[in-house]
Amino acid sequence: GGKVAVNISAGKNIIGAFHQPALVVADIDFLGTLPDNELRNGLAEALKHAFIGENALFELFEKGDFDSIRKAESLMEIVYRSALFKSSVVERDEREGGLRAILNFGHTVGHAVESLLEYRGISHGQAVALGMAAELEISVRAGLLDRAHARRCTELLERYGLRIRRAGLDVDGLMAHMKYDKKTSLGRARFALLSGPGKPVYDREVLDDVVRAVLADTIVTGG
C-alpha cells in the first residue's frame, strides 16, 4: 500500500510517509514454512478484507478451517484475492483522502491495543483481530450492522485461532491511546465500520461512552 511509518510511545504509525515499493514479492512456499501463530497474523488482515468487501474470501473462510487453508492452493487464493482487493482500493485513493480509510477497519482499536501494551506481547494481527471484534460491536450499537452478521464475523475470527478477548487491557488506557490515532479529529477517534455484509463505511464519529461500553463488554477481560 505504500505506507511507511514508525511507532512511538504515544501511538502507532504516528510518524510516516507514503513511498510505493519497486516490487512486492509474495512467496507462497515461504508462507508454508511459517508457524501457526505467524500464519494467523496474516489471516487477520485477510479476514479484514473478507469482512469489508472481498466476498469470495468471506465464502472461502466460511467453508474452510485453519487446517484446510494451510494448503498451498488455499494460501494462493487468499494472498491473490487480498492483494487484488487492497490494490484496487489503494489505486483509487493512494494517500487516504477517503475510500482507503476502509482498510483501517479494526485498526483504530487494534493500534490502541498495541500502543497500550508497548508493542510487546501481542502481534499486529492479533491486535487487529481484537480491534475488529470491538468495531463489529460498535457497528451494531451504532445501528449500522445487524448482530447476526457481526456474530458470523467474530465466529470466523475464533475459528481461525484469533482471540477476541484479552487479559491485561483496560478501558481508560485504550481510550487514552485512541486519542493519538492518526484518524482522530478534535480529540475524538474516527472509525471505519460495517453497515452490512461487505459494506464498509469510514470517517464515522462514535460517542466516547459508546466506545467505552463496547470495550468493556467485548475485548477487555479481567485477570
Give the positions of each predicted feature.
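Short, acidic Gly/Pro/Ser/Thr-rich loop/turn segments
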Residues: 31-33, 54, 110-111, 199-201
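C-terminal charged capping/lid subdomain of soluble metabolic enzymes
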Residues: 38, 44-46, 144-223
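Short glycine- and Lys/Arg-enriched binding-loop motifs that mark or flank ligand-binding interfaces
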Residues: 1, 12, 23, 38, ...
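Active-site segments that bind and position negatively charged phosphate/pyrophosphate groups
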Residues: 59-172
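Double-stranded RNA-binding/processing signature
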Residues: 32, 68, 98, 218-223
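A glycine/threonine-rich phosphate-anchoring loop and its flanking beta-alpha core
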Residues: 1-66
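A generic hydrophobic-helix recognition signal that picks specific residues
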Residues: 13, 20, 99-100, 189
